[in-house]
Amino acid sequence: MLKKKSLGQNFLHNPYYLSLIADTASIVPGERVLEVGPGEGALTEALLARGAKVVAIEKDHRLIPVLKKKFAKEIKKGTFLLFEGDALETKLSAVGIRGTYKVVANIPYYITGALIKKFLSEKKPASSLVLLVQKEVAQRIARDKKESILSLSVKVYGEPKYVKTVPRGAFAPAPTVDSAILHIQNISVGRFKDAAAEQKFFTLVKTGFGQKRKFLKRNLEKLLGANADAMFEKAGIHPNARAEDVSLAQWLNLAGIK
């Protein structure tokens, strides 16, 4: 089938990596798995083979009949539910997800940040995310040093792990860069007592990264005011630190979140 460039479609076809993604999710038979962008159903097959009850959201209307035909038996049995739409705009309740679930997906690079944010910050977040993303993005999220807005936005909700590099040749059509399997576990919104605390944290982080070449304290002077020095000392942050050198624990301390 002709791939849609506008949807960033690169379908994974290598059996080894398909199995590795499904195995990384540690699926218990009967467990509900939300698959974003099932494409032609290669990963879907691997998930169903491990006993998952798959709920799939596909944006490309041309693939809906393909998937319905391929998984007609599973649809009849109720182990595969297919919905047409944009996963970023779809409410979980609209696709029948109310309890515990996992997210497994080979997602277009251009929606990586938005999709991760959606499923980590839900009132009822996924228990884990296994995502195929751009290699550089996975490295940036999972590394322990040199933080970014994206890495902190993930780590404040869960624990990311870089699983394995997936070479561009494993896809059709092949993308211009390599990909990687990213596993995010132990997901919780419990760090934030309310929406105000959550907003305060992200305002602080985004302001801190506003001008990367400047020292963090300079970026936060207006926001923190006269208390900046005392707050930095309490959080254990060096006066000349840059935003990327500050750990999640220090950011939380700076935001008054324990």
Question: Locations of the language-model features?
Answer:
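Active-site catalytic microenvironments for nucleophilic, acid-base chemistry
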Residues: 24, 222, 257
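An accessory alpha-helical subdomain
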Residues: 180-188, 192-228, 235-238, 243-249
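Peripheral terminal appendages
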Residues: 1-2, 29-32, 42-43, 226-258
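Catalytic cores of RNA-modifying enzymes
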Residues: 1-207, 253
